[in-house]
A protein has these predicted regions:
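Short glycine-/acidic-enriched loop or helix-start segments at secondary-structure transitions
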Residues: 50-51, 104
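Flexible, glycine-rich phosphate/dinucleotide-binding loops
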Residues: 15, 85, 101
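Glycine-rich beta-strand-centered segment in the early N-terminal region that forms part
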Residues: 29-46, 54-98
């Protein structure tokens, strides 16, 4: 049986998160259902909101439960597709969690433009963090050239 790896969230941190808050485990390779794709994750985003989720439910998301795959956005390559709009070799952005492979709903993923390099820009400057910074600089601070 082919396996993959994933990080589980195992306990809330006291102070700063540390290695003991997570556990790296081997799991069977996920199988895809109709409408899903199997993604091999290349990049993971490490975001400030993770810490808040480790403390329990806040705002728009439920808190993390011990034993769950650690949350987070990732960029990966489609290695198997059962979703018409994505093909093997496409790169996508989505809520992948901290794992090497994930079976994800194709409709929930954003297909990336491979001409934009490095692809990791989609997790920073071209992603949620960059959008948040842009609102702060241009809408709030009214930055001028």
């Amino acid at each position: 049986m082919t396996t993959t790896r994933q990080f589980l969230y195992v306990r809330p941190p006291v102070g700063m998160p540390e290695e003991s808050c997570f556990e790296l485990v081997a799991r069977p390779m996920p199988q895809t259902a109709e409408g899903q794709v199997l993604v091999r994750i290349h990049y993971l985003s490490i975001d400030p909101y993770f810490r808040r989720q480790m403390a329990g439910a806040h705002g728009y998301r439920d808190g993390l439960r011990p034993g769950a795959v650690m949350i987070g956005r990732g960029i990966g390559e489609v290695v198997e597709s059962r979703f018409a709009d994505l093909a093997r070799g496409d790169f996508v952005l989505g809520e992948t969690g901290w794992r090497a492979h994930a079976a994800l709903d194709g409709a929930a993923l954003k297909k990336l433009d491979p001409a934009i390099q490095p692809l990791s820009l989609y997790l920073g400057l071209l992603g949620q963090s960059g959008g948040t910074a842009g609102i702060g600089l241009f809408d709030v601070a009214r930055l001028q050239p």
